[in-house]
Amino acid sequence: PGPALPPALPAELREALQRRPARRPRIYVTFGTVFNRSPALFVAAQAAARLGGTVVVTTGPDGDLPGLAQLGAHVHVHRFVDQGALLPYCDAVVSHGGAGAMLGAATHGLPHLVLPQAADHFRNARALSRVSAGSSVDLERQSVEAVSTELSKLLTDGAMSVGATLLAREMAAMHDA
């Protein structure tokens, strides 16, 4: 019998992440398991794919949106991926601003682009912006062009990387206290 749990990351995904093309970002796109059928997930995936790096999109159990698999060989679509195993490879996260993605990105010191959909997502996006650990695109502006532009800024703005790193350190210090 094999192991009870699958490997942390599928082998082909791990290899793609390790073969990082020069100066190309590795971006994780997730909308969790509640907002995984939102059109914004497809917009976010398209926007990330435009930047040409390695993109990992998780859809959850019922979030298969038509067309995600056709975004290019550099876009890897999975129902679930072990976020803790994936995030150390990433340069940024794009999400709806749910608790899981927020905590994962913050813990790993990753700049985070939030496309808020409902509930606490808007407040979470504002909190990230206040500490320069991320930014957001409002509901009415969530086009591929707007999201791609904002994601490009997020990846090139050194202040966002610094803010995300400081947030991770602050969270680690709280854990150690």
Q: Predicted regions span which residues?
A:
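Nucleotide-activated sugar donor-binding and catalytic core shared by glycosyltransferases
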Residues: 1, 18-21, 44-45, 65-177
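A nucleotide-sugar donor-handling region in carbohydrate enzymes
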Residues: 1-26, 31-35, 59-65
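Residues at alpha-helix caps and immediate loop-helix transition turns in enzyme cores, especially N-
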Residues: 9, 39-41, 124
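C-terminal, well-structured subdomains that either form a transmembrane helix-short loop-helix hairpin
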Residues: 28-30, 38, 89, 93
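Structural beta-sheet core signal
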Residues: 29, 55-57, 114
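Short hydrophobic signal-anchor/transmembrane segments that target glycosyltransferases
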Residues: 39-54, 60
